[in-house]
Amino acid sequence: MSNQHPKKVLEMVIRALIVDDSALIRKVLSDILNQDPKIAVIGTAINGEDGLEKVRKLKPDVVLLDNIMPVLDGLKTLSHIMEEFPTPVVIVSALGEKAEEITLTALEYGAVDVIEKPSGILSQSMHEMAEEICAKVRAVSKADLNNLGCIRDLEHQIPENHRKKKNSLREKTSVRNVLAIGASTGGPRALEKLIGSFPAEIPAAVLIVQHMPPGFTASLSKRLDAKSALRVKEAQEGDIMEEGTVFIAPGDYHMEIVRNKVNGFGEDTVHLSCGPKELGSRPSVNVLFRSVARIYGPRVISLVLTGMNCDGADGAEEIKKMGGKVIAEDQSSCVIYGMPGEIVRRNLADFVLPLDKMADEIVKIVR
């Protein structure tokens, strides 16, 4: 096959299979991945049925899978892969509400991460994303598939005493605590489990930075809102901080909190910006963490969940300096132990907890 690099396949490299019905996307992704000395494209497939045959035959280390295809669509293909040949899968997704919803469902079904399929001049925009694409493939090749259990019907797992009818017009009170959360690869699944475990009356505002392409965070917010006792929304410029509400940074925007006080009165609000990426990410966990450390000091509880690289560690240092608490997800429940691992390596964690123990500990702290 013309897109393969036989010489590299003989070495200790990550063996990638690309499944996409677009010949252009297959070629562009192949060109990008084959330029990375640690990755070799061992095959391509034109639809899900073809992809399953190639997975059976080639046994790749990572599959890049289009979410919308003829013959056998991405979700059905993913389900077969995870049931028959568990393999780290990265969803290659188009924009649009339908595609974004399918992608989030795929993440629930066992996909590890998502990359955006650009619109417009495909080849040019794809090559601009080359570094991110290669980094994700390298990271997901190390994913712990034991922690990719599906989180379906999560609403039924929420204790009855945690549920209440949501009220978008909550009584405005000063924010007593701030829970700041950072996540990357594996994060959407972890967030569903964590946010769905909080009681409605938790005395804290919740701020989340999840590394995702633009558009997907809006769909993620709606999905979490439907499965949580808390109100969950994609953050907007000027949103007023309030307890019992979860604010998710929109894709491609940094999220900070600013204090608007005049003569001692005013409210803390969300500020969004398109400033430079930090550690290759926008939104950045570090940007959020530094912001809440400055304003809330010892009232901050920060969580660093599953994810690649080390975003959040520098910000966690600032939170510690200001008297706040830092919680890192234990490796036993992480899909990728990059971000929380860096917290532990720097000795910044007050607690190191598996995902299913976090909510109870946080409720104890804030109450």
From Swiss-Prot:
It catalyses: [protein]-L-glutamate 5-O-methyl ester + H2O = L-glutamyl-[protein] + methanol + H(+); L-glutaminyl-[protein] + H2O = L-glutamyl-[protein] + NH4(+). NCBIfam families: PRK00742.1, PRK12555.1. The active site is at 184, 211, 311. Keywords: Chemotaxis, Cytoplasm, Hydrolase, Phosphoprotein. SUPFAM superfamilies: CheY-like (SSF52172), Methylesterase CheB, C-terminal domain (SSF52738). Its main location: cytoplasm. The keyword Ligase does not apply. Its EC number is 3.1.1.61, 3.5.1.44. Phosphorylated by CheA. Phosphorylation of the N-terminal regulatory domain activates the methylesterase activity. GO terms for molecular function: phosphorelay response regulator activity; protein-glutamate methylesterase activity; protein-glutamine glutaminase activity. This is Protein-glutamate methylesterase/protein-glutamine glutaminase 2. GO terms for cellular component: cytoplasm. It comes from the Archaea. It is found in: Cytoplasm. Residues 172-367 form the CheB-type methylesterase domain. Belongs to the CheB family. PANTHER family: PROTEIN-GLUTAMATE METHYLESTERASE/PROTEIN-GLUTAMINE GLUTAMINASE, PROTEIN-GLUTAMATE METHYLESTERASE_PROTEIN-GLUTAMINE GLUTAMINASE. Involved in chemotaxis. Part of a chemotaxis signal transduction system that modulates chemotaxis in response to various stimuli. Catalyzes the demethylation of specific methylglutamate residues introduced into the chemoreceptors (methyl-accepting chemotaxis proteins or MCP) by CheR. Also mediates the irreversible deamidation of specific glutamine residues to glutamic acid. The keyword Nucleotide-binding does not apply. Residues 15-132 form the Response regulatory domain. The gene is cheB2. The modification 4-aspartylphosphate is found at residue 66. It comes from Methanosarcina mazei (strain ATCC BAA-159 / DSM 3647 / Goe1 / Go1 / JCM 11833 / OCM 88) (Methanosarcina frisia).
